Regions:
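Polyanion-engaging groove/track-forming segments
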Residues: 1-212
């Protein structure tokens, strides 16, 4: 009948791409440019790289074993598979990725307490990275593609993250934390959070249970 169907249920926010972006960013800041964390950051969908660019960059860094501080140095190896044009593009993407990470590091690294670090992190996300705008764009794209539940979840993700930040500031704001410990406490908080989805399309048919 062409009527959108919306499944009424709560979802764990820890599984959302915006959380993947946030946790991988904090892992890199706290523990260095680990392969898995860097690729999770890139593939979160928030850095503006097209899927083919993500895949091509992943293949390049795997082939030439780019890890750790090598991300901060210009790529120079081409082998038999890449041209100078490819290399230039990979370096543009590398600079894009590293700029995000190092800007966030500058915002957070100069502080010692949990509260200060969270405020620095929020400043990066809200002011430097414009995360709320990026989230709105993702939600709009999901809605236009017909992924109504995903769009509704995305639309709420920023507020959920801000609530966790507020809780951390209120409960352990005065405690000194390393970058690694900050990631752990943010992850622990987000792991407990659920999103109760509200349909973004008013014409959706709601399918739920007696418990809701």
């Amino acid at each position: 009948w062409g009527i959108p169907v919306f499944i009424d249920q709560k979802r764990k926010v820890i599984q959302h791409p915006v959380v993947g972006f946030l946790l991988s960013l904090l892992e890199i800041i706290g523990s260095g440019y680990r392969d898995s964390a860097v690729m999770q950051l890139i593939k979160s969908g928030f850095l503006g790289l097209a899927e083919e660019e993500q895949d091509a960059l992943e293949n390049y860094v795997q082939q030439f074993k780019i890890r750790g501080t090598l991300w901060k140095k210009p790529f120079s190896r081409m082998g038999d598979n890449y041209t100078a044009e490819d290399l230039n593009r990979f370096n543009e993407l590398r600079e894009q990725v590293v700029s995000v990470i190092e800007t966030a590091r500058d915002r957070i690294g100069k502080y010692n307490t949990a509260g200060e670090k969270i405020k620095g992190l929020y400043g990066f996300l809200a002011d430097d990275f414009m995360m709320e705008d990026r989230i709105e764009a993702m939600a709009k794209s999901q809605q236009e593609a017909g992924f109504l539940d995903g769009a509704a979840e995305t639309a709420q993700s920023w507020n959920v993250i801000c609530r966790i930040f507020d809780q951390i500031v209120e409960t352990v704001g005065e405690e000194r934390l390393s970058g690694r410990a900050l990631r752990q406490i943010v992850e622990a908080g987000l792991a407990e959070m659920e999103i109760g989805i509200v349909p973004v399309n008013p014409d959706s048919v709601l399918v739920g249970t007696m418990q809701r």
